């Protein structure tokens, strides 16, 4: 078994909670991950992809401050659906997710549900 150590970045509505999408309070804008071999505990591959936002197209000022992304950079990102399918293919068949934050898997599942991809996990 391999370990997928994953870190997601996400955006939120720049105009506050009262304007957020009801089923998507946070929209993933980047997936970063490494594969760590289960037996050797070595990094054997890495993955990184910026995602073009579809719901919150303008960066929240705090997210911009933390991630150093610009709206211009995000406008050149890949589609979320394509990125998630590529990412899960990259993960392989026998893996366990490990995350830097307690919300990463929750937000991945929420974003996948929003884009009607929840059945592929």
Stretches found by the model and what they are:
Residues 103-121:
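Substrate-recognition/cap helix-loop segment adjacent to the acidic, metal-dependent catalytic center
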Residues 2-106:
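Conserved non-catalytic scaffold segment of RNase H-like nuclease domains
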């Amino acid at each position: 078994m391999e370990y997928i150590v994953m870190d997601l970045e996400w955006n939120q509505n720049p105009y506050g909670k009262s304007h957020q999408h009801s089923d998507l309070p946070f929209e993933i804008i980047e997936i970063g991950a490494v594969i760590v071999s289960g037996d050797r505990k070595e990094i054997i591959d890495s993955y990184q992809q910026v995602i073009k936002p579809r719901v919150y197209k303008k960066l929240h000022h705090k997210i911009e401050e933390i991630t150093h992304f610009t709206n211009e950079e995000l406008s050149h990102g890949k589609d979320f659906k394509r990125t998630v399918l590529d990412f899960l293919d990259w993960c392989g068949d026998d893996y366990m997710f490990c995350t830097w934050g307690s919300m990463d898997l929750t937000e991945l599942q929420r974003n996948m549900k929003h884009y009607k991809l929840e059945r592929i996990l």
